[in-house]
C-alpha cells in the first residue's frame, strides 16, 4: 500500500486505500483554537438522541474519517 508522509489513504467505510487521503492531508485546514469569550448556557432538559439503524458506520466515516496506523491498517475511526 502507498503512504503519504506516514499517512495511509483512508477510503469509504474506514478501509485503507492506496491513495494519499490520510488524516491531516491538508495541514492548512487543521483545527486551530481561537481565544474568545464564550458563554455556556446550561439547561435541565435531557439530551436529544436519535438512533437510526445502520447509520452508525456511515456517520463515523463521515464525521471523523479513518486514522491510519504506521502499518497502513486503519485504527479506530477517530481522526478529526
UniProtKB/Swiss-Prot annotation:
Belongs to the metallothionein superfamily. Type 15 family. Keywords: Metal-binding, Metal-thiolate cluster. InterPro entries: Metalthion_15p. One of its GO terms (molecular function) is metal ion binding. It comes from Coffea arabica (Arabian coffee). Coiled coil: none annotated. The keyword Transport does not apply. This is Metallothionein-like protein 1. Metallothioneins have a high content of cysteine residues that bind various heavy metals. It comes from the Eukaryota. The keyword Metal-binding applies.
